[in-house]
Design a protein with these regions (language model features):
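Mid-domain Rossmann-like dinucleotide-binding core that forms the NAD(H)/NADP(H) cofactor-binding site
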Residues: 1-65, 69, 84
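Structural detector of well-ordered beta-strand residues that form the stable sheet scaffold
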Residues: 16, 40, 129-131, 156, ...
Length: 218
């Protein structure tokens, strides 16, 4: 919700969301609730893209499509109104600069991979809005600062302000404005937490959100 709010979504906005994990999917749902007329989801896991489509988003598989070209075409050559990077430093692009980021990480130079954020900045329209809920743990280079300045973009990021949002979001869940159940892929007893984390990391197409329940029978 905060990711969508940071994107300052207005009625009839076109919004692009990178990443269809739990954060990205909830950002998609939130953007639609806030009045976006069009939401475009970018990922490559089929099941996660299917969940985004189920919510009402149009989908782009970044392994099959040039994302920036597709977004420019879908927005009439202008660029989308707002972009949300729900990927962060785990971004896996195919551009040559992303390969350099991987090499630098291997040798301990610690550059975060930021291909999703770079795509987002280049795909948003002039005067557009950039929201960054995706986590970046260190430093990144090849930042498209020139494009950001030239376009006059608004950039906001940060982890969710839990105390600010918890009460209002629980109310929206209770009154049916938001649905959280669609995202739950697995329910496990608390004793299987380690196994759940391992599967979530290694099988991201099938595992989206795990509920751990103390006392649950195996």
């Amino acid at each position: 919700w905060m990711a969508a709010e940071n994107a300052d979504i207005q009625p009839d906005d076109t919004v692009a969301v990178w990443g269809c994990g739990p954060v990205g999917l909830f950002a998609i749902q939130s953007a639609i609730v806030m009045g976006a007329s069009r939401v475009i989801a970018i990922d490559h896991y089929p099941n996660r893209l299917a969940l985004a489509k189920q919510l009402g988003a149009e989908i782009i598989d970044f392994r099959e499509t040039d994302v920036r070209e597709a977004l420019m075409e879908m927005s009439g050559g202008i660029g989308v109104d707002a972009v949300i990077d729900a990927v962060g430093m785990e971004s896996h692009g195919f551009a040559i600069d992303n390969m350099f980021d991987v090499v630098k990480q291997k040798v301990g130079m610690g550059a975060d991979r930021a291909s999703a954020l770079k795509q987002a900045i280049l795909a948003v329209r002039f005067g557009g809005k950039v929201s960054i809920p995706g986590v970046y743990g260190g430093m990144t280079d090849k930042w498209p600062l020139g494009a950001m300045m030239e376009k006059g973009l608004q950039v906001r990021g940060g982890q969710t302000h839990v105390q600010k949002y918890t009460k209002q979001l629980l109310e929206k869940i209770e009154d049916g404005t938001l649905d959280t159940t669609f995202l739950i892929s697995h329910r496990l007893p608390l004793e299987q937490a380690a196994e759940g984390y391992k599967n979530f990391k290694e099988q991201q197409n099938e595992w989206t959100k795990v509920i751990l329940k103390p006392g649950m029978e195996n």
